[in-house]
Amino acid sequence: MIKRFLSWWRGEVQPLKRMPETYEEAVQYVYERISPDTVSHPMFHFTGGMAVRNGLGLWDRESKLHQHMLKRFGLCHADDTGMLITNAAHARKNGENYDPWPDVDRCCDHWERAGYDPRTMEKVD
């Protein structure tokens, strides 16, 4: 089942000419590669989120996209930034607007309550 939902991401889709460096470029990249059927399935946000996070290098703290997401949203965790990209592409595919800031606030609140700085993921005393 997971293979089915990751098929949109595989290399045969279209190799990257260059890695997206901004939120908008990443959203556009994902948007162009997903179908309405894919985004409407609940597994998309799990498997699709993993594919976005890993495929766009969101774990690489030196990548331009990671640095952009940190500067723009104050988040460094790849699951959080991947969720923003995935949610935006999903909304766009459905002809809806997406405001990332409520999700950003929710992520920041989660990490702060857990005792971590969402910008660095370092433990805060």
Regions found by a protein language model. Name each.
Residues 37-124:
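Compact alpha-helical subdomains of small soluble proteins
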Residues 2-7, 119-125:
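Low-complexity, Gly/Pro
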Residues 1-2, 104:
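Intrinsically disordered, low-complexity regions enriched in Ser/Pro/Gly/Gln/His and often acidic
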Residues 2-47, 60-63, 70:
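N-terminal low-complexity, intrinsically disordered segments
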